[in-house]
Amino acid sequence: MSAYPDASFLCSLYRLQRNSYEAVNYHKSMPSRLCVSSLLLLEFRQSIRFQMRLFALDRSKGFAKTEGMAMLRALQSDLAQGVFEMTAPDWADVHRIADMLSEKYTEENGHRMTDILHVASAIHLGSEVFLTFDANQKRLAEASGMEVPL
């Protein structure tokens, strides 16, 4: 059973937070590698960089550059070791699916574009399971017929 995570799931793997225990245990129990796309990795890296900037401007927000850089190094190490299955989606098809999801669900539920693209990527890749800690994205994935176990 293939699974596709969003950035909230990846962040829970690489930074100790409320959902980390659940994310790590689920990831360890998976029979196959998580599928990741360049879009997901870009969003994850961007999020880390943004949190480092927030911290630099106001130490009560975000997290320190040393922590962020450690997260980026750990991700790179995991990618090099094959912890994740790097996928190369057909972005035209992902965009077609995303447009369909947007038309069907956004007006009623208010989904963000990146969330729609991640669910569309998972559908395109044939993933049966979507891993997220974002309630609105969970609603979209479930409405799209995916299992969201967390």
PLM features per residue range, with description:
Residues 82-131, 135, 139:
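Active-site neighborhoods of divalent-metal-dependent phosphate/nucleic-acid chemistry enzymes
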Residues 1-63, 147:
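Short, well-structured N-terminal submotif of metal-dependent ribonuclease cores
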Residues 22, 43, 97, 139-141:
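Phosphate- and divalent-cation-binding pockets in alpha/beta enzyme and binding domains
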Residues 34, 83-87, 148:
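Short secondary-structure junctions
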Residues 54-84:
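Helix-adjacent hinge/juxtasegments
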Residues 17, 38-42, 69, 88-92, ...:
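Alpha-helix N-cap/helix-start motif at coil-to-helix transitions, marked by capping-box chemistry
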Residues 5-6, 36, 110-113, 134, ...:
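Histidine- and aromatic-rich ligand-binding microenvironments
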